[in-house]
């Protein structure tokens, strides 16, 4: 009977990508088959996130739940990867001594030998080093599962924002070779992928070396990816305002495969707070980039990240954030109350803002952005939208779903699985709080 692999993933899309590559790697080297049931697994991997304190505590809570499985099956291998593993290293075993393997985001390619060593020696294996881009040279070609796929183009971040652990857990920025990225996209397209999402902690900071030794920037990469036969849509995340260049904006104007949606984190609308965060840009500079982007693509939708209650944030600072929210018209956000991360400069700042004030501000911010997003969705009612059909609806197996150019989920009545992977025109009938409902226009599939 085939041995089983269970992977649980916390955090960002980069972690989702890494988890898929772990499955590819262990499927090829150890013939492990992915299962959705941890209780039947021979190997359990937890791919972790350390961006917030609650996310980190969630790791040890989950490991505690798996301790009984280890007691029942001493041959079970439990591994912890991702950013908590990178940050904590061998210290993870002080709280969870039954963990066999600890690996970082840059060492996941060493999983087969680490698992083998843990089994043969009965000793824990820990490797959270930063061997730069080596992991991409050691990973098998990605498996295709549906019409969409993630492609990692660079790793790490060199911005060192005062609140962020990423440079310490994923290392400095390292771009994959340009030709390697294109080769992966071609492989995906040849196997039925029609939409790719290019990933990086600072994806628009990509500087990939070409076969002739030249460095190509992210705007050039987008244009070449768009030229790959079969690729009809391109998304990317996450961007940094500092490197949202005029060349990138021009690509949005000229490359039809780029969707009309961008995620561009700003964190705060206060220059004073941005300086304390070491974001190295002002609100005015951010607004200038948004103005140019909207001039290039008038109907583009923009989402962002916000941290509420950063140490020293005043009511005036928060009001400036709300002003920016309304001026830009963000329609979605990842927004959280500030959580001090050990080892970051911001962790040394006095955090004396009452918790109830932070919660109130977060509620106001999220409420306003949700309202703006819903208003955009309502304006889409009556329109016809081109969507890529990706799967059955999660709530109704009699419906299919896909995404619009501006990142709205659309559900429509149809139970024919052969539509999955095709583009279709859908008439939008109704706007719900988190999705749209529509009717398939017959004869529009392609």
Swiss-Prot record:
Enzyme Commission identifier(s): 2.8.4.3
InterPro entries hit by this protein: Elp3/MiaA/NifB-like_rSAM, Methylthiotransferase, Methylthiotransferase_CS, Methylthiotransferase_N, Methylthiotransferase_N_sf, MiaB_methiolase, rSAM, rSAM_horseshoe
Annotated Radical SAM core domain residues: 143-375
Keywords in alphabetical order: 4Fe-4S, Cytoplasm, Iron, Iron-sulfur, Metal-binding, S-adenosyl-L-methionine, Transferase, tRNA processing
Gene name tied to this protein: miaB
Record's protein name: tRNA-2-methylthio-N(6)-dimethylallyladenosine synthase
Function as written in the Swiss-Prot or TrEMBL entry: Catalyzes the methylthiolation of N6-(dimethylallyl)adenosine (i(6)A), leading to the formation of 2-methylthio-N6-(dimethylallyl)adenosine (ms(2)i(6)A) at position 37 in tRNAs that read codons beginning with uridine.
Root EC class: transferase
Reaction equations catalysed: N(6)-dimethylallyladenosine(37) in tRNA + (sulfur carrier)-SH + AH2 + 2 S-adenosyl-L-methionine = 2-methylsulfanyl-N(6)-dimethylallyladenosine(37) in tRNA + (sulfur carrier)-H + 5'-deoxyadenosine + L-methionine + A + S-adenosyl-L-homocysteine + 2 H(+)
GO cellular component labels: cytosol
């Amino acid at each position: 009977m085939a041995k089983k692999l269970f992977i649980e993933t916390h955090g960002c899309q980069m972690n989702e990508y890494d988890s898929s590559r772990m499955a590819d790697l262990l499927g090829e080297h150890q013939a492990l088959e992915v299962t959705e049931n941890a209780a039947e697994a021979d190997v359990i991997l937890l791919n972790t996130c350390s961006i917030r304190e609650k996310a980190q505590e969630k790791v040890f809570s989950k490991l505690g739940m798996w301790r009984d499985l280890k007691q029942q099956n001493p041959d079970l291998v439990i591994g912890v990867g991702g950013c908590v593993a990178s940050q904590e290293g061998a210290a993870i075993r002080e709280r969870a001594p039954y963990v066999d393997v600890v690996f970082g985001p840059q060492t996941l390619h060493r999983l087969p030998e680490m698992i083998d060593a843990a089994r043969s020696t009965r000793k824990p294996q820990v490797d959270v080093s930063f061997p730069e881009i080596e992991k991409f040279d050691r990973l098998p070609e990605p498996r295709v599962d549906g019409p969409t796929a993630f492609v990692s183009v660079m790793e790490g971040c060199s911005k060192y924002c005062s609140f962020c652990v990423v440079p310490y857990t994923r290392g400095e920025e390292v771009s994959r070779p340009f030709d390697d990225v294109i080769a992966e996209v071609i492989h995906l397209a040849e196997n039925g992928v029609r939409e790719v999402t290019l990933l990086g902690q600072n994806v628009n900071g990509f500087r990939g070396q070409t076969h002739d030794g030249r460095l190509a920037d992210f705007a050039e990469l987008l244009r070449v990816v768009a030229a790959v036969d079969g690729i009809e849509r391109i998304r990317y995340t996450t961007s940094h305002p500092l490197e949202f260049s005029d060349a990138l904006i021009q690509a949005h104007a000229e490359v039809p495969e780029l969707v009309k949606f961008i995620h561009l984190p700003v964190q705060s609308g206060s220059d004073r707070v941005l300086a304390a965060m070491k974001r190295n840009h002002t609100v005015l500079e951010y607004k200038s980039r948004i103005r140019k982007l909207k001039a290039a693509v008038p109907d583009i939708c923009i989402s962002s990240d916000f941290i509420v209650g950063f140490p020293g944030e005043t009511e005036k600072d928060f009001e400036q954030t709300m002003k920016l929210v309304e001026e830009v018209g963000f329609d979605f956000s990842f927004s959280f109350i500030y959580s001090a991360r050990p080892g970051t400069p911001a962790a040394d700042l006095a955090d004396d803002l009452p918790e109830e004030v932070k919660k109130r501000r977060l509620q106001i911010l999220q409420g306003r952005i949700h309202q703006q997003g819903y208003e955009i969705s309502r304006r889409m009612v009556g329109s016809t939208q081109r969507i890529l059909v990706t799967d059955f609806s999660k709530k109704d197996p009699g419906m299919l779903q896909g995404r619009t150019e501006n990142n709205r989920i659309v559900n429509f009545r149809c139970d024919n699985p052969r539509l999955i992977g095709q583009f279709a025109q859908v008439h939008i009938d109704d706007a719900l709080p988190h999705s749209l409902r529509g009717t398939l226009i017959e004869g529009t599939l392609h």
